[in-house]
Amino acid sequence: MSEQQALSQIYLDANATTPVLPKAAKAALSTMETMFGNPSSSHISGLQAKQIMDETRRKAVQVLGAGSGQVIFTSGATEGIQTGILSALCAAKGKMHAHKQYSILYGATEHKAVPESLKHWNKVLEIDAQIKAIPVDEKGTLDYDFIAKEVPNALMICTMAVNNETGVYQDLSALEMVIRGHNADVFWMVDCVQALGKRGLELANTSIDYAPFSGHKLYAPKGIGFVYIREGAPFTPFIAGGGQEGGLRSGTENLPGLAALNVIFDELLDNGDGVFANAGQLQLFRSQLALALKNAFPTVVFNHDFANSVPTTLNFAIPGFSSKEIMDLFDAANLRVSSGSACSSKVTRSFVLDAMGLPAWQSESAIRMSFGPAVTQQQIDQACDRIHHCAQALGHSCLLNATGNIDEKTQLQGLVQFKVGGSCSWLYADPVTKTAVIIDPLPELSNRLLTILQCQQLQLVAAIDTHGHADHQSGRIALAKAHLDNQHADYLGWPVETTEVEIAQRRFAAISIGDKYLVRIATPGHTEDSISLVLCDKDKLLSGALDVSYVFCGDLVLMGSLGRTNFSTSDAKQMYQSLQSLAQLVGDQSLLCPSHDYHNEFVTNFKAESSRNSLLNDVLNGAVTVEQFVERKVELDKNINDQTGEEIMCGAFTGSCTKKHLQEYNGSELKEKLQRDSQVKLIDIREPHEYALNHDQEFDMNVPLTRLTDFICQQQHNKSQELILVCRSGSRSQVAANALARLGFDNVGHLKGGYALCQSS
């Protein structure tokens, strides 16, 4: 597969890991090829290896200002954390008094390795102390009053020097005064991983007992780290065995890692090649990146105060965009950033920002951009240029009002699906008349929808809710105020002025959208005001034939479920009638577009749902009476467990998420497939802005997930066409392929691992 645009990688995720400094890599390689002795051996090769280890330790003591404290080499920060916690809690256990309740304190914004390790050793050692999180304020600073109150009864307190997500640093001197002023003997561990090379450290001048560090966060290889132990602090080996490290940490020393650290320490001590920028220069780099973000995304919000943050980290959010959307966008531009800690990449929001009390949208949209001291001016310049192109790409797909274009703006036509959590909004646009209708608009999408309407110069015909939603406020009001000020409509947004059409000898109200009718059908049950909206061909309907494009069914039918009927305005008897009535009108193959999609299945039809939902199948086949349906529906709805602060589920899942068998290809297999089979269609399913930034020449088309339902509609009569889907990581392509297979597309495959693994191979 050949790339249309060759974009070099710009790596701005240094808080997750860093490339190995070339000189450090060379030193490591030397210890693998020539100076490969075991430091514990007494022959010359061993002595040479031991000299490297001793020299590295001596430099570590200098860098840390460790004085007479000890520096023990480990496999990384997590081992260092275990070492500090185990040592402290073993010693603390011996001082505990029976029948007294103790606590263990940690900062609420600590890396998850700390609280999880505390819970583990608290249980294993049978200490049974209360583990308490120290609150932080909106700037990420620890609550000194809380510490003063709780630390007298604490066995151990864990804080961090610099936060890995926000770059916020703690004033260790002020913190020490609070801690020692209220408990002179409590064991104190400080996670210093992100402080190395960014903050001055004079550990011997503090009462910090334990401080773990990691090599790969500062240009050394993965698998090497070290931990500082204050002179006189208790110590329990985490790893016992051959007695290496003076019996403090057994296991053959990682000589290549030590050799690399040796080079890094030279840079920190100004004895190297001078590749590390000073603090002033790093601040200028941050300012340049911040300005580029502001220019590209004028509404950007920074999630931390630069005044109490190291200059190598920027944490920001862009209103209206999830962190995943920005991650995917930047990744398409080969600009590497993250949505938080790399140790928790599946988390959808930041617990750090939650602890700081920031609004939920900022936590859910947070992006971390981080660089190390070896970054160059050229790299920062390139990053700023790439950020500008990312904004242009969003403008290209009308998600941002950006000046300038990568290409002509993509004309919007057909159906687009938008999601917030499990809730869906639908926009249908007719390119000829430049008219549009929006179904079930979500308030979180108001700005995005308004931007699209403006950018595409679309006239909004109506913004309609399929029912009054219990789980969210409608975004219809904002849309109507901007585009439908003179329209008279009911409280769901259905216009007063309509056309009357006939379907199956029944009369319905309809409105026109280009060459389509949008027909309103009352389908009460989930709520008494529930309606379904059928988009169908205007000319065929006038000729007496119903040709359905889409059925916007609200919460009548959900993927794998039926809408709940246990609200005060629900009526299961009416749902029974609505299901039968709608199915008779539209048939079992018409595409149903619900207002919720909890399992990323996008769209469905009565045939697909009947095959996995026995209750629905029985209703449509007349196998249950209305009374039996009501009885079974009551039992079904008992499976819904509403929780305060969580998304309200609008139906109990009854179906199966069993994945269909899909053909999966790796990069070489796909290349061979394309060479021997010219009939296969290769489809890039990333969003248009990702596709615009970077895509391969072989692709027949771009079908983003937001347009997948539209694609399914267009391909309804060509389900045997062989399709191979590709995305960034393989996740979206697998989800899309499963959705297609579930609806009868029987020749679908995808690129396993996506662009990421294809490029690496």
What do the predicted segments below correspond to?
Residues 75, 107, 191, 212-215, ...:
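Active-site neighborhood of phospho(di)ester-bond hydrolases with catalytic His/Asp-centered motifs
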Residues 444-494, 502-503, 510, 724:
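Active-site metal-binding motif and surrounding structural segment of the metallo-beta-lactamase
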Residues 1-411, 421:
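Pyridoxal 5′-phosphate
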Residues 82, 217-218, 459-482, 526-534, ...:
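Di-metal (Zn2+ and/or Mg2+/Mn2+) metal-binding site signature of metallo-dependent hydrolases
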Residues 412-456, 500-600, 605, 723:
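Catalytic core of the metallo-beta-lactamase
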Residues 397-416, 422, 577-681, 687-688, ...:
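Accessory terminal helices/loops
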Residues 143-153, 448-456, 510-514, 672-674, ...:
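Short amphipathic alpha-helix with an adjacent loop that forms part of the alpha/beta core around
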